[in-house]
Amino acid sequence: MTGLIDLFKEALVYPTKDYKALLIFGVIFLVANLSSVFTAWEIELNGGILALLALVSLILYFVTEGYILSVVKESIDFNDEIPALDIVANFVDGLKLLVVQIVYYIIPTIIVLLVGWLSGTYSAIMDIVEYMGQDVANTTVNATTMVNSVPQEYWAALFTGLLITCIVAIILYIIFGLLLEIAMCRLAKYDEIGEALNFKEVIGDIQEIGVGRYICWYILLLVISIVLGVILGFITAIPYIGILIAFLVGAPFIALFGSRALGTLYSDAE
């Protein structure tokens, strides 16, 4: 079993093993974000060009997601080489990953919406809107007065409901986010959406990795990604060329690093 420190050291070096592959991936990243580049350069585009760029960005989004999945697969298979870009195959894999992501996030979303209803959040909002609506006809009443006129118990009910809903939402999205990472590994390994949606096997894989080890890995990944993101932010601040470097090298580097770290971690469950 690879130590977490060694795992992340190797993952940080991984993107530099093939600069050509990194730059090719970077070009895809750059083209997918051309609208952001033009915005940063304060270049105004007409609606037709913006629509075309949006379509290209959407297509390349799935390509990049699928490519990241291929990096995870190669890492699970203990392959140290950065995989070649296959636009069609990567696009299809990106669509598969989207299906998995929707399933894993729609479950906590439904639960959170249900909790919002049970906690009285929606009814509190309706009570406040209805109460404030009574003063709408009075044009002499300003917004501040309308808000202050609402009984405190209405605001208390809203605050309590929102607090409960937010706490449940944070917990659920963290849990399902952790499950999704392993589901992504199963999709990469078996190339079947059904395997990624097999919650029993996903939980079993996490147990094989070790719950504590997995949580520590996730925290370290977040910390390192934040540090890299801050560095990337400083680079982006460089006029004109900064944003090119960010999309051509920085963002692809972080993506390859994260996917390599994930695939290597999952290989411990093999």
For the regions a language model picked out, list residue spans one by one.
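Interfacial aromatic "cap" segments that immediately flank transmembrane helices
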Residues: 2-32, 85-110, 159, 178-230, ...
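Short, small/hydrophobic-residue-rich motifs at membrane-helix boundaries and re-entrant hairpins
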Residues: 20-41, 49-76, 96-174
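Functionally constrained cores in energy, signaling, and assembly domains
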Residues: 33-35, 39-46, 84, 90-93, ...
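Juxtamembrane/interface motifs at transmembrane-helix termini
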Residues: 43-45, 113-114, 122, 224-225, ...
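Selective recognition of hydrophobic, aromatic-rich stretches within alpha-helical transmembrane segments
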Residues: 45-76, 155-196, 232-270
